[in-house]
């Protein structure tokens, strides 16, 4: 399963999620909303693409610059709906030192240690970071990656029986390409991963890029990060099929 998650906030939050039973992995890649993608004959920030044309067009734009599986889905969810879904799992314990400096954390009342944070507080914190023009897009995206990483690590055992069903219950408020068959596949994949005898490879990173003059653009490092995200060699990246669940 490969899904582009879009949190439909004032500044949208984007995370690529790749769950693969065959590779026993959950890989998460936070994509900065400022990343410039092709849209309307020019390059615009992914957030602007979302505002103009929605999540399906964002998935298409990312697929034009990266070797995404052809069956990559999208899931756009409002912050209030996401907060309600995530609240059932309780607070997650997150460390933000890999994303933000001690000074930046202090500005938001956060310490350098691992701390518990509720779904609502996590959303408020990430929204504030997105609005902070003194931070590079990579900093705020890295904080988002840290939250999602903590969530999947700490809630994995509960996800097979709760996450797909939770999405079904709020399906009327989602913008998504996920079908009933896709949700059943997600459920089976999560069940396999949650009960795996081997440690699940859970990683969460931020998509690198060139940040200069107020523009965050695709670089060789960006493409290499996407190849690594899908566990692909450079040669295989051009033929990513997404045939695994």
Over which residues does each language-model region extend?
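Second-shell loop/turn segments in exported
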Residues: 44-53, 65-73, 130-139, 155-159, ...
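C-terminal solvent-exposed extensions
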Residues: 10, 27, 35-42, 173-245
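Amphipathic, coiled-coil-like alpha-helical scaffolding segments used for oligomerization/assembly
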Residues: 51-111
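Extracytoplasmic
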Residues: 9-14, 23-31, 57, 69, ...
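Entry/capping segment at the start of metal-dependent catalytic domains
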Residues: 1-29, 127, 190, 225-226, ...
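Extracytoplasmic/secreted envelope proteins and their assembly/folding machinery
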Residues: 13, 55-63, 79-87, 123-126, ...
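Flexible, polar/acidic helix-loop-strand segments at domain edges
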Residues: 87-169
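Flexible, solvent-exposed short loops/turns enriched in glycine
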Residues: 24-54, 98-112
């Amino acid at each position: 399963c490969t899904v582009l998650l879009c949190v439909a906030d004032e500044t949208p939050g984007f995370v690529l999620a790749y769950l693969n039973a065959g590779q026993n992995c959950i890989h998460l890649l936070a994509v900065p909303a400022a990343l410039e993608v092709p849209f309307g004959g020019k390059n615009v920030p992914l957030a602007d693409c979302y505002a103009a044309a929605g999540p399906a067009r964002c998935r298409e734009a990312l697929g034009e610059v990266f070797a995404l599986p052809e069956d990559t889905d999208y899931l756009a969810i409002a912050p209030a709906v996401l907060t309600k879904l995530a609240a059932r799992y309780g607070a997650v314990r997150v460390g933000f030192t890999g994303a933000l400096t001690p000074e930046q954390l202090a500005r938001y009342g956060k310490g350098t240690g691992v701390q518990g944070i509720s779904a609502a507080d996590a959303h408020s914190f990430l929204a504030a970071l997105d609005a902070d023009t003194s931070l590079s897009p990579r900093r705020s995206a890295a904080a988002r990656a840290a939250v999602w990483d903590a969530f999947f690590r700490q809630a994995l055992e509960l996800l097979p029986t709760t996450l797909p069903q939770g999405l079904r219950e709020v399906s009327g408020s989602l913008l998504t390409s996920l079908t009933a068959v896709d949700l059943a596949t997600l459920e089976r994949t999560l069940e396999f991963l949650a009960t795996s005898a081997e440690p699940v490879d859970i990683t969460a990173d931020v998509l690198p890029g060139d940040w200069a003059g107020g523009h965050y653009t695709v670089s060789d490092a960006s493409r290499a990060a996407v190849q690594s995200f899908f566990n692909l060699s450079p040669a295989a990246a051009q033929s990513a099929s997404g045939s695994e669940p």
